[in-house]
Amino acid sequence: MRDPIETVMNLVPMVVEQTNRGERAYDIFSRLLKERIIFVNGPVEDGMSMLVCAQLLFLEAENPKKEINMYINSPGGVVTSGMAIYDTMQFIRPPVSTLCMGQAASMGSLLLTAGATGHRYALLNARIMVHQPSGGFQGQASDIERHAQDIIKMKRRLNEIYVKHTGRDYDTIERTLDRDHFMTAQEALEFGLIDKVVEARDVSADESK
């Protein structure tokens, strides 16, 4: 059976640009990377996380002061993979603007709210979902106990991150994340996960640059 990701990548359009050396072709994502646009699309896992972190580090090396734009449409995924992206976002010098299109669930919502203050957006019909981490393990009783302790520590750490970026108190975050909690873009704004709901691009801001 063909890998669905491979199938999608084979359908990625190419963009042809004219340069003083002739024509140059880029896949659409590479071309957008030149504009400092990164996509977090699909499940968050190690391979995707590595690529996103590499792009963040590359754009920092290219210009340590210019804003990076991260577009998110993700159902979430592996916590450690998401934390690698989160830590890299906090580590690099350029501010990272985040925008949710479609959905930002689980780790996707954490990456959304981790954007630079004042630069966290969601499109009008985006859906945001927050919850506590989940996992399963089989083995000896003592090993299961250790894994349970570890996931509880991870839950506390994730709660602390949401507290930091939303301004909500710890108890509110813990209650909200106790079960799957779905929000509209407006509800995410009111909760403090984002700073603005956007329906159309601000043309006046682009023209003033």
Curated annotation (Swiss-Prot):
InterPro entries in the record: ClpP, ClpP/crotonase-like_dom_sf, ClpP/TepA, ClpP_Ser_AS
Entry annotated with the keyword Protease: yes
Enzyme Commission number(s) from the entry: 3.4.21.92
UniProt keyword list: Cytoplasm, Hydrolase, Protease, Serine protease
Catalytic residues (positions): S106 (nucleophile), H131
GO molecular function: ATP-dependent peptidase activity; ATPase binding; serine-type endopeptidase activity
Subunit structure and binding partners: Fourteen ClpP subunits assemble into 2 heptameric rings which stack back to back to give a disk-like structure with a central cavity, resembling the structure of eukaryotic proteasomes.
Protein family according to the UniProt entry: Belongs to the peptidase S14 family.
Protein name per UniProt: ATP-dependent Clp protease proteolytic subunit
